[in-house]
Amino acid sequence: EVPAGTTVLEAARIAKVNIPTLCYLKDINATANCRLCVVDCGGRALQAACVLPVTPNMVVKTNTPAVREARKLNLELILSNHEKKCLSCVRSQNCELQKLCLDLGVESGDRFAGAQNEYEPDMSSASIVRNNNKCILCRRCVGACANVQKVGVIGPVRRGFKTAIESPWGMKLAEMACINCGQCITACPVGALTETDGTKAVWKALGDSAKHVVVQPAP
């Protein structure tokens, strides 16, 4: 038994039944965008478990051939507009999208090959790098910014194929009211939002014999 209002996804997690997700973050983001959590409830169409409330005597099938195929199809559609440079991505081997591809047997993202959006990475911020070429439009960063930090400076813009997660009027990160908290980075399941990498600057400083370098570890 679960409390009234519990979703099928949360009930499944309580019961230790695995249902894959990409866009869901408990109490932060439940928008059913990725459609990877679809389940069979006996109706004409598969339902998104993350927004589907549990009802009495409900029968839910989470791992039928039709469910697995639908999840795989939706994952391939997500990959069709995703930059596939996994070897050079800082999230390689720590990427939720990559892990789901392995779990669902998706070997390439070429099934729906076609036009792709191309964006210039935003490196204007002192602490955050935004690369929308890797964005999967899950909106987890939007939920974290609005619901955790209560700042709400990013959101979906435009429609259809041109939809992107950006700041208002196309402003760069350094130009808007971003407080550089990093909650969006923590929420991002892929490499679309990452921390600014200061590795090269550190190596350069260490190699400068005229510079006295002090290291301070963080707790």
Give residue spans per PLM region.
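A basic, amphipathic helix-loop patch mediating RNA/tRNA/ribosome contacts
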Residues: 8-42
